[in-house]
């Protein structure tokens, strides 16, 4: 069932066929094994940012350490980015194909306090922050917390 919040998230990621999954891995210098392709396909199927536990639930035949190692590899090669949404569990989301996870590529994330889903809002830029002399940002985590479109329709 499609929902308003899920639709916003899905519009940001174009559907891919098998060759596109392979190309996406190769473009990030990741060897496309059957397991990595399975994990990437599963990630692309989520309508929100996902946790390691979410992947475990979807891929119950793959052990947790393999999933964790694959996520770590995908993070290192900028295939996914990590999101600290304040829940204590790191979430992940697929990067767009032109993302290098540099400061200019950053976008806002939204955490719904009602349904506890986290969404990438790729069209919403992270606000510019002026830093004092001598300070330089390496990463920025900008999370808005509130009620998503799905949950606000239920209230």
Language model regions located:
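Short capping segments at the starts of secondary-structure elements
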Residues: 32-34, 46-51
């Amino acid at each position: 069932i499609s929902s308003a919040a899920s639709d916003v998230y899905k519009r940001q990621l174009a559907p891919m066929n098998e060759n596109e999954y392979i190309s996406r891995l190769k473009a990030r210098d990741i060897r496309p094994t059957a397991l990595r392709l399975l994990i990437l396909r599963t990630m692309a199927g989520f309508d929100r940012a996902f946790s390691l536990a979410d992947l475990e639930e979807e891929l119950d035949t793959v052990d947790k350490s393999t999933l964790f190692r694959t996520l770590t590899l995908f993070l290192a090669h900028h295939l996914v980015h990590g999101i600290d949404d304040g829940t204590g569990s790191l979430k992940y989301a697929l990067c767009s194909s032109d993302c290098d996870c540099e400061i200019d590529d950053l976008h806002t994330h939204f955490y719904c306090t009602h349904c506890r889903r986290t969404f990438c809002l790729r069209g919403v830029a992270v606000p510019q922050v002026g830093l004092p002399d001598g300070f330089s940002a390496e990463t920025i985590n900008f999370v808005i917390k509130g009620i998503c479109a799905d949950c606000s329709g239920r209230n």
